[in-house]
Amino acid sequence: MIGKPRGRRGVNLQILPSAMTVLSICAGLTAIKFALEHQPKAAMALIAAAAILDGLDGRVARILDAQSRMGAEIDSLADAVNFGVTPALVLYVSMLSKWPVGWVVVLLYAVCVVLRLARYNALQDDGTQPAYAHEFFVGMPAPAGAVSMIGLLALKMQFGEGWWTSVWFLSFWVTGTSILLVSGIPMKKMHAVSVPPNYAAALLAVLAICAAAAVLAPYLLIWVIIIAYMCHIPFAVRSQRWLAQHPEVWDDKPKQRRAVRRASRRAHPYRPSMARLGLRKPGRRL
């Protein structure tokens, strides 16, 4: 008896997230090739492509229910390549190869990225973390570090040579970025950022402006992103400290948390720092 021919097996979509991760590694390594060929624009574009793929692969894995231990390990290795090794080598080849200290600072950056990723993986398996910990990074995330590094190249592309291309400024900036990567400073995760409904229209307008700037002034946009990210750090620290002091709101939604904070401010209108400094409300008698 002749059996029925087997149908062609469909493509297993569960490999798609890992395929995207591998593509991001290819983009990151190809960026180094273009940097060696003195094509910094192409190198920066490929690093951006690697970052986009890195941001999408995890979401695709969750949508397809294709999360696995192997996928997580590949993703971590991809981050080390794309946001550690690649930005370090691109910046070294493009701007720092003339000075011996250049190799030292980019090596420091790459090592700090690896250490930061190792700590992140360890914290993921730590069951003792408080409930709010998943809303914050510990230290600067690796993609933000890569943007900080590429920002130096963006300054040169936009304005040419200047004090911003001096070895002292470059070394200071790269070292500072490396310290932020391995620091314990809390920084907000994007998925944990909530926007009140009355600010939604303004946010859409800002996104439209950023989309236009990405075409008209991409190098300046990189620095707008860097400055905005640096400015958010004090607010992230304040938010993390407030959450640590209010465990009763750990499971609340952002809207409920904002209501609790407003009520707390109304109940305690004077900040502790004002009391320590002996400050008083204008018009109030001593």
From Swiss-Prot:
It is a multi-pass membrane protein. Keywords: Cell membrane, Lipid biosynthesis, Lipid metabolism, Membrane, Phospholipid biosynthesis, Phospholipid metabolism, Transferase, Transmembrane, Transmembrane helix. One of its GO terms (cellular component) is plasma membrane. It comes from the Bacteria. Signal peptide: none annotated. Its EC number is 2.7.8.8. GO terms for molecular function: CDP-diacylglycerol-serine O-phosphatidyltransferase activity. InterPro entries: CDP-alcohol_PTase-I, CDP-diaglyc--ser_O-PTrfase, CDP-OH_P_trans, CDP-OH_PTrfase_TM_dom, CDP_ALCOHOL_P_TRANSF_CS. Belongs to the CDP-alcohol phosphatidyltransferase class-I family. This is CDP-diacylglycerol--serine O-phosphatidyltransferase. It comes from Mycobacterium tuberculosis (strain CDC 1551 / Oshkosh). The gene is pssA.
